Amino acid sequence: MDKIPCTVSILTRNSATTLARCLESVKEFSDVLISDGGSTDATLEIARRFGARVIRQDPRFLSGEGRIEDYAAVRDQALGEAKEAWFFFLDSDEYVSTELVAEIRCITSSKPAGVFILYRKYVLQDGRVVDCSTTYPNPSMRLFARAAVKGFRKRIHEVIVPKEGVVPQSVKGDLYVPLDGDIEFWRTKRDRYIALEVKRLTSGTRAFWPLIIKVLFRHAAISAHYALRHIRILLFCRGVKMPFAHEIERHRYHLRLVVALWRARHECSTS
């Protein structure tokens, strides 16, 4: 069977524990591009074993420790290195369902240039797929024709920007997000996002009080929305539920972001 005419872009940094699973799920794609941030484990060896191309993340978009500070810029860098007209991006700890692979094959071979929304599902460490989570249906624009987009935006939680007049469509099949590691792993990961978000929010000349009030109300509303969804899940979900510790972490993220922003203002005023 012919390869799927689509570039798959994967960000890596010491991703040896999850990369093989990810690459195995996209082995039917014609162009697999690894954007690496200076891995020192077996990441690059695994990439070569699967025949993936490797580029180094531009140091302009990284911190002094080599971690990404501008995800949109790193994604744009990979987009510029793509060989195919279609582009699909994911993280090294994610993997693709066979149904989604078949759907992407159909889209890239028969559909006009467009942008497509995929749906992510969490997978527990015992292999069970989570049926009910407060973030479901968890949509994400991950597949697109390069001619249909402007590029990426947002330094964290990056998103692709379609060109004017391009209406995103939905895709069948799931993108799996394993809940590997303990809760501290996810807490550390989110704390990094908090630090980047605070840096972004405080880098301009906006007045502090309107900023923190806006952030406080926005994240309080999001947290309340998740809480209501969680109550509904507890009452009506008969399938596999997202672990409670992970649901609580979402509320912790929003609270810690506001606290970190307040502390950043205090540090600036006393320095």
Which role does the model predict for each range below?
Residues 94:
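Aromatic, loop-rich ligand-recognition surfaces of beta-strand-rich domains
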Residues 25, 36-46, 50, 59-60, ...:
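A conserved acidic beta->alpha catalytic loop
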Residues 31, 53, 165-167:
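Conserved beta-strand segments of alpha/beta enzyme cores
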Residues 2-7:
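Extreme N-terminal starter segment of soluble prokaryotic enzymes
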Residues 49-83:
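Active-site-proximal specificity loops/subdomain of glycosyltransferases
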Residues 87:
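Short aromatic/hydrophobic "clamp" motif used to bind/position activated sugar donors
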Residues 10-28, 33:
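Short, well-formed alpha-helical segments that are part of the catalytic scaffolds
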Residues 72-79, 98-267:
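Catalytic-site signature of metal-activated, phosphate-bearing donor transferases
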